[in-house]
């Protein structure tokens, strides 16, 4: 069983998962939500899809408040009973139990088999959810994706909105950004959308609509070359690169000109 926060599965987590898979046993991971880390990189549904793509057999989702006062020894015993865990895999900085007193050495002292992996660094920075969040806050999408090992994404159902995009020739799929999901830096992004098993290049505005004097933060995506109704469909929007800041244009025509430039930039290699 792989142990860690597993707010998604970044390249450091992938090392733990691969080690767990190398044992030839059923592979499970333990994830913890809540606590000091605040908002998560991914929702529970998004994490489920990530874990499935990594070949995880099951995930045990725990709330920090439920386990924070559990002594380390009791916590390991809980995992053994709950998941029939026989082999543990964790990073050398893994801490658990009341007061974060449990360490990999604690697991060994209990007579359990445990594989301990070294901390992974990107330059001078420790690879982890905190570093990825800092990248998202600054719009450094390419670095965030390198640390994740896959594109950061939003998954959800398309809802009806005012239809302003369609009125100016750029229809958009609007997906509510979950309250529990860590926010990006506001701006316009190059994205990829997967719908009905097909991939579409796209541009996504995450933020307000200043040209229309609307300060509500939205996530609206224009799928290039898509024809059809997206309302009610479940989409995955992958963020590739930040194209520009969100800004107020002096007219709708100026906004359309900029959107056309954005589309040309995204499709320049086609």
PLM ranges: what are they?
Residues 52-58, 139:
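Structural recognition of alpha->loop->beta junctions
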Residues 70-172, 194-195, 250-254:
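Classical nucleotidyltransferase
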Residues 161-270:
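Phosphate/ribose-recognition catalytic cores of enzymes acting on nucleotide-derived substrates
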Residues 57-67:
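A conserved beta-strand->alpha-helix junction
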Residues 40-47, 68-76:
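Glycine-rich, highly charged phosphate/nucleotide-binding loops
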Residues 59, 114-116, 237:
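Generic structural signal for residues in well-ordered beta-strands
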Residues 25-28, 57-58, 86, 113:
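Residues at the starts of beta-strands that form the adenosine-phosphate
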Residues 1-49:
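N-terminal catalytic cores of NTP/NDP-binding nucleotidyl/phosphoryl-transfer enzymes
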